[in-house]
Amino acid sequence: MVPEPGPSANSTPAWGAGPPSAPGGSGWVAAALCVVIALTAAANSLLIALICTQPALRNTSNFFLVSLFTSDLMVGLVVMPPAMLNALYGRWVLARGLCLLWTAFDVMCCSASILNLCLISLDRYLLILSPLRYKLRMTPPRALALVLGAWSLAALASFLPLLLGWHELGHARPPVPGQCRLLASLPFVLVASGLTFFLPSGAICFTYCRILLAARKQAVQVASLTTGMASQASETLQVPRTPRPGVESADSRRLATKHSRKALKASLTLGILLGMFFVTWLPFFVANIVQAVCDCISPGLFDVLTWLGYCNSTMNPIIYPLFMRDFKRALGRFLPCPRCPRERQASLASPSLRTSHSGPRPGLSLQQVLPLPLPPDSDSDSDAGSGGSSGLRLTAQLLLPGEATRDPPLPTRAAAAVNFFNIDPAEPELRPHPLGIPTN
């Protein structure tokens, strides 16, 4: 987190003598801060353990989530407890040498969390707008290099300026006695805020807005493909059925409505993600710049805005997996749930594309069997096996019992935009119906 600016120069506090007095904050404030700290540490630890223990979640995209949850976990374990004591007592009550170290970790962990959010948006952007080239571009070594680059930038924006004293340039006033508030100059605040917040937030807005536009545009395309090629899908799967024009028309309308709801859900998802990010962090960084200019923000208000930014580390492990179907399923397997055995038995008993000896298998959807035409600027040229075809035909992938893939299959351009956070696919599952025995 960018240190609080102000006209005072030195970041080395003057320490009062004697033991610390009783905390000035109320019991409700202390209890609320303890709940925030416990929830932040528990939620991020749970999701890190979930990704590490569940093979279905070990893929390149979730590597960025592990980095995000690690930075948020460090905020909850390293940054929040001293900040709580500092807010309750009104002064720094820990060892004097820990003040500068804690401030550096504060800046590094919060900056790393914001930069990891930027990497996640970039990963979603590449996956949805260029799905055929995603695995060629976002390889595990490149993902690791991006994560290391984010943490290196966060460390350079925190430890290096504090150790070299760049934040003290141009100041000569003594510090406030007993306080651990890093007072920085306006140039340092502008540079640090731009590198760790304004540039990443601009990239996040750009990528998510592009995803939103693609979701709205391609939801209409998916609905038209679903309506126009339902009969072709039936012939591809060789599922005989009796034509019912009235029922098919109603089904087409329901499918179009469902696609519209999926696009709306994608829009709401983006709104929630962007809204929570800017609500928690934008007030703090605006207050940083205002304080550097006029020194007119009280310490109490600045503490409130600081904790509002900390709460972003509490919300990230709740908001992001909330829209990811794989996390929900893995969490149901990871945590004991009384309803899980009954739901699993009901799922096994339901008629679908299964045999009596093969176990549960994934159902076929329209996106797996329909030739989906790609726009002219698509990445169809990267498909070496297409043979110059203008469409992309994805066949159903049937897994053997107990077989699992480490990375999810590449989504098509039409379905990925609506399903950019692993929302349940919009296409109906096609199930074969047994043929009746002919009678004379």
From Swiss-Prot:
It is a multi-pass membrane protein. GO terms for molecular function: G protein-coupled serotonin receptor activity; neurotransmitter receptor activity; serotonin receptor activity. It is found in: Cell membrane. Pfam families: 7tm_1. Interacts with MTOR, RPTOR and NF1. Interacts with CDK5. Residues 362-371 have a biased composition (Low complexity). Its main location: membrane. InterPro entries: 5HT6_rcpt, GPCR_Rhodpsn, GPCR_Rhodpsn_7TM. G-protein coupled receptor for 5-hydroxytryptamine (serotonin), a biogenic hormone that functions as a neurotransmitter, a hormone and a mitogen. Also has a high affinity for tricyclic psychotropic drugs. Ligand binding causes a conformation change that triggers signaling via guanine nucleotide-binding proteins (G proteins) and modulates the activity of downstream effectors. HTR6 is coupled to G(s) G alpha proteins and mediates activation of adenylate cyclase activity. Controls pyramidal neurons migration during corticogenesis, through the regulation of CDK5 activity. It comes from Pan troglodytes (Chimpanzee). The gene is HTR6. One of its GO terms (cellular component) is dendrite. The keyword Transmembrane helix applies. Disulfide bonds join C99-C180. PANTHER family: 5-HYDROXYTRYPTAMINE RECEPTOR, 5-HYDROXYTRYPTAMINE RECEPTOR 6. Belongs to the G-protein coupled receptor 1 family. This is 5-hydroxytryptamine receptor 6. Keywords: Cell membrane, Disulfide bond, G-protein coupled receptor, Membrane, Receptor, Transducer, Transmembrane, Transmembrane helix. SMART domains: 7TM_GPCR_Srsx. GO terms for biological process: adenylate cyclase-activating serotonin receptor signaling pathway; adenylate cyclase-modulating G protein-coupled receptor signaling pathway; cerebral cortex cell migration; chemical synaptic transmission; G protein-coupled receptor signaling pathway, coupled to cyclic nucleotide second messenger; positive regulation of TOR signaling. Residues 346-392 are annotated as: Disordered. Residues 1-27, 89-96, 168-185, 294-299 are extracellular. Specificity for G(s) G alpha proteins is determined by the length of transmembrane regions 5 and 6 (TM5 and TM6). Residues 53-62, 123-142, 210-266, 324-440 are cytoplasmic. Serotonin binds at D106, N288. Residues 347-358 have a biased composition (Polar residues).
